[in-house]
């Protein structure tokens, strides 16, 4: 997929669509654990936005935008997915019981968080890493 493309309209539209899909994916990720959305759907949207950039430009351009190796991203996601239930277990709760806490912010009110956000973040990283590893391996063989 290392070819010169002169599709100016496609490239311009892809950049705009990239940001729109990323914002929508982030909002679905934050919608999270108990409502439609979460790590899997957000990860699919994040990966699809990177696929749009890959189609409009090439793999090297996409790697400049996201320089982290996607196989490492799969490992990071698995660490979050495994560490979240183990952390609640060490805090004296049952395995996979979510712990709630507040993050104090200086000017704003504290943000209420649960460990489900970290688990969903791990799922997001694993999904993005898996989808992009598959897409890149298919694209590099052509």
Swiss-Prot record:
Membrane-spanning intervals of the chain: 9-31, 35-57, 70-92, 116-138
Pfam families documented for this protein: MnhB
tRNA-binding found in the keyword field: no
Regulation: Na(+) extrusion is completely inhibited by the H(+) conductor carbonyl cyanide m-chlorophenylhydrazone (CCCP).
Molecular function (Gene Ontology), one example: antiporter activity
Keyword set, alphabetical order: Antiport, Cell membrane, Hydrogen ion transport, Ion transport, Membrane, Sodium, Sodium transport, Transmembrane, Transmembrane helix, Transport
UniProt GO BP: proton transmembrane transport; sodium ion transport
Top-rank taxon: Bacteria
Protein role: Mnh complex is a Na(+)Li(+)/H(+) antiporter involved in Na(+) and/or Li(+) excretion. Na(+)/H(+) antiport consumes a transmembrane electrical potential, and is thus inferred to be electrogenic. Does not transport K(+), Ca(2+) or Mg(2+).
Recorded family membership: Belongs to the CPA3 antiporters (TC 2.A.63) subunit B family.
Subunit structure, as described in the record: May form a heterooligomeric complex that consists of seven subunits: mnhA1, mnhB1, mnhC1, mnhD1, mnhE1, mnhF1 and mnhG1.
Protein name: Na(+)/H(+) antiporter subunit B1
């Amino acid at each position: 997929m290392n070819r010169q493309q002169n599709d100016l309209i496609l490239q311009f539209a892809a950049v705009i669509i990239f940001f729109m899909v990323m914002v929508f994916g982030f909002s679905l990720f934050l919608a999270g654990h108990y409502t439609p959305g979460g790590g899997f759907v957000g990860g699919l949207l994040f990966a699809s936005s990177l696929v749009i950039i890959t189609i409009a430009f090439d793999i090297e351009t996409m790697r400049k935008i996201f320089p982290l190796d996607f196989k490492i991203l799969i490992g990071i996601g698995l660490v979050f997915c495994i560490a979240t239930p183990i952390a609640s277990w060490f805090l004296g709760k049952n395995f996979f019981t979510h712990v709630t806490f507040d993050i104090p912010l200086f000017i704003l009110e504290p943000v209420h968080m649960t460990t489900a956000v970290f688990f969903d973040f791990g799922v997001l990283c694993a999904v993005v890493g898996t989808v992009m590893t598959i897409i890149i391996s298919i694209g590099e063989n052509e």
